Amino acid sequence: MNRIGKVSRKTKETSISVEVNIDGKGQYKIDTGIGFLDHMLEQLSKHSLIDLKVKAKGDTHIDLHHTTEDTGIAIGEALKKALKDFKGIKRYAHAMIPMDETLTRVAIDVSNRPYLIWKVKLKVERLGEMDTELFKEWFQAFSQSAGITLHMENIYGDNSHHIIESCYKALARSLRIALEIDPRNKKSIPSTKGSL
């Protein structure tokens, strides 16, 4: 079974196309025009095993906010399309990911009830060309458009690159588990309500 979602999103600020394959192998082709964001999205694809294609063009002459946020929106929308009716998924997952001196914890509920808890403090204002405040914007946009409750907490760490990379990797590992088809519950929606 291939759960594939495609989204094209065009505004006066950005033009973005995204394709996800939840049942992929973690292959990616990513070009947002923002080097550090590309690196993080590569981690997301590789460690979730979700194939991810992203092509984004934005008003980066102003700043990177619109491209970062709209990329999160488009990836979330594509993921939600690929899930269709949420049938058979495990729904809940969590991961604790170390990266050298850093440890980050993520818990998710793929419930169509978007919410972000963000307990991450970065020690620098920029990583590469990105303002570090944009990472929260990306995760907020992603969780809202994907319909995912996302709790993200950096427990400790000193290096801001390691902290944010561990956030993307922990989300990736959580998605890998939560989006798997449960062999004991393949045809059922994981909710007593009967829908998500």
Curated annotation (Swiss-Prot):
Its main location: cytoplasm. It catalyses: D-erythro-1-(imidazol-4-yl)glycerol 3-phosphate = 3-(imidazol-4-yl)-2-oxopropyl phosphate + H2O. It comes from the Bacteria. GO terms for molecular function: imidazoleglycerol-phosphate dehydratase activity. Gene3D superfamilies: Imidazole glycerol phosphate dehydratase, domain 1. The keyword Iron-sulfur does not apply. Keywords: Amino-acid biosynthesis, Cytoplasm, Histidine biosynthesis, Lyase. Its EC number is 4.2.1.19. One of its GO terms (cellular component) is cytoplasm. Belongs to the imidazoleglycerol-phosphate dehydratase family. NCBIfam families: PRK00951.1-5, PRK00951.2-1, PRK00951.2-4. HAMAP family: HisB. This is Imidazoleglycerol-phosphate dehydratase. It comes from Pelagibacter ubique (strain HTCC1062). The gene is hisB.
